Amino acid sequence: MILYHGSNVIVEQPKLIRQNRYLDFGFGFYTTTNRDQAVNFAQKVTDRRKIGAATVNIYSVEEAVAFKECSLLRFDSPDEAWLDFVADNRQGTYQGKQHDLIYGAVANDDVYRTITLYMTGVLDKEQTLAALKIRKLFNQLVFATEKSLQYLHFEGRELV
């Protein structure tokens, strides 16, 4: 499987760095199979930080091996379990089992607005899930432990 990570720097050896904000799937190194999504993120992060150059880092992972050797939490669609997991992580309240790898839909800006309406009580769970079904969602694979990072191999980078 080929994976991409958008950044403002080259990331040959990914590290787990604590963020100062809460993300969809919690703490970890975020990747995607969607190159366009990585390009978009690289441009956003470079604009926000005003340093570096928009860079798409390219990785490979033998998913059959990694998914067997690591604990994997997989969301195949943005369902109720995914919504609860993302909402808990975004609020910093997730207390469940920790996993090595987490795969599922990305809560991008549009999706995040919908989730925020849910977290603030404007939308209920049913309304939120219905709204998410009409959105085009991309994926993310998060490497959440040092163990999981062992399966991620840097293949190169592309300035975008």
Regions found by a protein language model. Name each.
Residues 1-29, 37, 43-47, 81-83:
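Glycine-rich loop/turn
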Residues 23-24, 40, 44-160:
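Conserved NAD+-utilizing ADP-ribose enzyme module
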